[in-house]
Amino acid sequence: MKKLKPILLLCMFLAFIGTSCKKSSTNPTSAVSMSLKFNGTAKTSNTVAADYIKSTGTLQVIGKFGNEGLSLMITDIKVGTFAVGDIVIATYSTTADFQNTYLGSTGTVVISSFNSSTVTGTFSFAGTTVDGRNGTVTEGKFSAKVITQ
């Protein structure tokens, strides 16, 4: 019985090691990121979300830069170039309470790739706040995981 105990412990240890090891994924995950310049100041973020509402074909991409944030809402989403103001609503807020939000009036959003799991693209637009201040978003790009509703 004394010889059986070490063998049993060794078997339990090997079983534990064999089941606790996890294989690394062979599929690399896409990076989630957004970068842009607002009025010439560079901003980058890894806090990005993309919500796809399948029934309406609408995609909303949101990026957070501390207390600031950007939102792109695109209707009838597909790979292609879209004009801000037509089927794209683009906003940039410089405060967490959205009191200083620039609503895009001109610009473009280019969707480079879009599928059930990821979306990537570029964007630029000019916008105005409700009190008439102007702002520009340039050199925008994003990569996000898609959540389908």
What are the language-model segments listed below?
Residues 1-3, 66, 121:
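Hydrophobic transmembrane alpha-helix bundles
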Residues 3-6, 16-40:
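Bacterial Sec-dependent N-terminal signal peptides
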Residues 20-29, 67-74, 143-149:
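Repeat-unit-sized solenoid/scaffold elements
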Residues 32-37, 41-118, 126-130:
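Surface-exposed helix/loop patches within compact recognition domains
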Residues 112-149:
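C-terminal or internal capping secondary-structure element at the end of a domain, subdomain, or sheet
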